[in-house]
């Protein structure tokens, strides 16, 4: 990747390719924006890149814990050629996620701010003509707590597949998901930011050569969960036309909570606020500085496994909630009722979702010895309650089912990681895909089974298809980073083609690609990796086991609580 303005070596190429002499300027409903042209090796047509375009008013002051408002207009030409700050978050976790997940050659310097409602645009369109290219809007992951748009470079996907790529930001953590469970702070602010960004795309993307009638939303982890939530929301009708969830769906128990009041009170107490009423808490928290809320975030120890406290009292994430606006009911209820946006939907998981990044780098599981006995596994499953929601009574049954077939403590550890991967991602993803299929929406599933050469040296060589691995293929990392293998380059070309075909037609299949079966009652899906082939019934046995276990638990008579009169 070269910037013509910076890289002398590419000057000749710039001239030869007829590189536009003036940088691109595009009209938006709020004012003009100035971008820059960036060339990708092997492509005659440069990509116009616009970084840090505001899609909403800065969510400061009285707009903290409030729905996003339209951006204010400007009369000058706004320079949108530098990366916007990422939304406020724990800087250490934010840096780590960016380092591990970026598809760039080197990570960009990260800044953080509460003023963060910006998006980046990559368009290969000839801006002198009114093109109508498919638009792909990327929603980043990070547990709704960390992450940012600029970690992910849309250049390769845009150039290779002739699509407009938009990467968006949304409020995170306390700023994005603080909820009192009533009208004082309903919550889901980060999801409402995502909706605002999609509205902005509808109003403006035509001027960037994009087709507002062909918008695909795609995201990974909490970004995949967000895509799935947006499909279920009445607010998003006609804002997008296809959807892709990579390793994250609306049924992730870790990212959804029904009762929010107790967590709101914990946050308020930690911030030194009174908790007499919701109004008092919200008023007090709005007066706090960004730094003070950051201190609260760090003290709350989100995104960490607590081995000491009562798992039922612990909180790993601030989450999506039922706010009556974005989500009228719980995701499971909306899915069961089949009343939501019936759009072509692709859902996928990776082979070892709980392989290394989540347990070792993010949540800090005590597994560095590389082995595990059954008793410890059962205890760890119970300590994982905040993210997997398995009751204490079920933990020995579950560990026996997964780990009982071997005495080898190394195998037991691997099987424990498989169990957590199924609970966190595998089972919810298959269940969501089945719901969409049953509702009549065209549905596709995949399992990604490949280890990118860009993986961290700290990661065990045996972990293939870890959480986030598919991003390197989807966003064309082999064309941006150095040192990719030939196999990896081919794989990324194929994956980008599948994803862009889906964005164009609602069907990933195309000439020269292995046939990807629709996810119908035969439950065909695609295994993507060094060998890419169709298979059937992804996680079928695991889903059956957990469904039966939870049904038995639900049918058990609850112990009646003694009520003092």
Swiss-Prot record:
UniProt keyword Metal-binding present: no
EC number: 3.1.1.1
Glycosylated position list: 79, 389
Extent of motif Prevents secretion from ER: 565
Secretion signal, residue range per the UniProt entry: 1-18
Location of this chain's protein in the cell: Endoplasmic reticulum lumen
Pfam families: COesterase
Disulfide topology: 87-116, 273-284
Active-site residues per Swiss-Prot or TrEMBL entry: 221 (acyl-ester intermediate), 353 (charge relay system), 467 (charge relay system)
Similarity-based family: Belongs to the type-B carboxylesterase/lipase family.
Cited function: Involved in the detoxification of xenobiotics and in the activation of ester and amide prodrugs.
Protein name: Liver carboxylesterase 1
UniProt source species: Oryctolagus cuniculus (Rabbit)
Organism lineage: Eukaryota, Metazoa, Chordata, Craniata, Vertebrata
